[in-house]
């Protein structure tokens, strides 16, 4: 460990003090309640003032919660009395307040824990003189980078970053970043009490507790999980910097607009040194391998590693990840779950697209004096296709069609007004058209839009107790067609502004937009 003082210094520099007393301030829970209500925007990327406190009943509910927290004696554990040490009550009569307790406190904790990291981020941008608007990068910006950089790669590896089995692993990662001791003690205490409450109330097994926690406390879980992912990538960059004689050519950080901790990180390395972390935590021999060209792209929990090197190099790179997770983060991960494939014969699924490398061969006749000969030129093209099977599976789970892709009605929407039903289906179609506008072939997307269009017609016919044919004959088929082909003009990588393809269009050009700030919901569930 003496050989790597830079790592310890980096960890100390990342430590941030926290204001533990803020947990007992009323406005923190009001702010958390506002975020729970689904207000758009970010706490640190929008206006500094907090707007939207227009629901007096909701504020009264938050006020009642704060009063109960202040008055309740069993909020903190009582020494030598485990029966009274209850964070939330799990009696049936207090179920609403119990759930409300855990949601508000976890949201309030997540808001407080984000503040030092956001201040550090803002200071970084001010030091680099980078305007905020330049950092609002689109998810689609990854694909032009992959089209230019992955065309010369030979192998690609899909990496699904694993979730730690126990929440304590995520808590331990924060210990090198937090100086406030009460915060360090409060988080494990809250997680332990939350786990016991769920286990006693719903008979949830310990293996499923992290899943339940991630579903009900999304903001806090995202922060903890992204801290863990950031630690993985920080170690990767740290090991790279130890080899100073090889230069890191490009390193970019992209932050998502809505939540700064839901980040997209792009790491492009040229002449990278791969270092295998030994079992005795850096005290053993470090052996390295020179890679002439390596690309690493990650979004949320999935990463893609592409290389121009050999299969042996990719295999060593795979074990580098496995050893990092097993011996540094202390949880088991099987190496066979990371697949290494030859890019020319493989299509990988990433960010809602099926991407592959297509080889185009062209014959050129050259004439030199009296001799003529043919030259075969092979060029690589990065192909992006709409994953029709995955999207149909997502539509089937959402009850828009059958497993085979036959449209069905949406019964739970049948009670809504006709305009609301058409608006919901139309919004889904527009979002899919917008998100998958970079596809090389649009036939699959036309099929998805047809399923949604006919599902909308079946839902309206079900509501009016009629058949689809009679309903469309009475209102006219042009009603749905005109609505579903209506598109908004948005800024794209092809200037000037262009309008996406229509329902019956035959456009083949790929359009990457600059306003895609999150993954489409259907893509996330596929």
From Swiss-Prot:
Q: Name one GO molecular function term.
A: RNA binding
Subcellular localization: Plastid, Chloroplast
Q: What is its main location?
A: plastid
Q: Does the keyword Plastid apply?
A: yes
Query: Gene Ontology cellular component?
Result: chloroplast
| Matching PANTHER family | MATURASE K
In UniProt terms, what function does this protein have? Usually encoded in the trnK tRNA gene intron. Probably assists in splicing its own and other chloroplast group II introns.
Its protein name is Maturase K
**Where does this protein come from, organism-wise?**
Iris pseudacorus
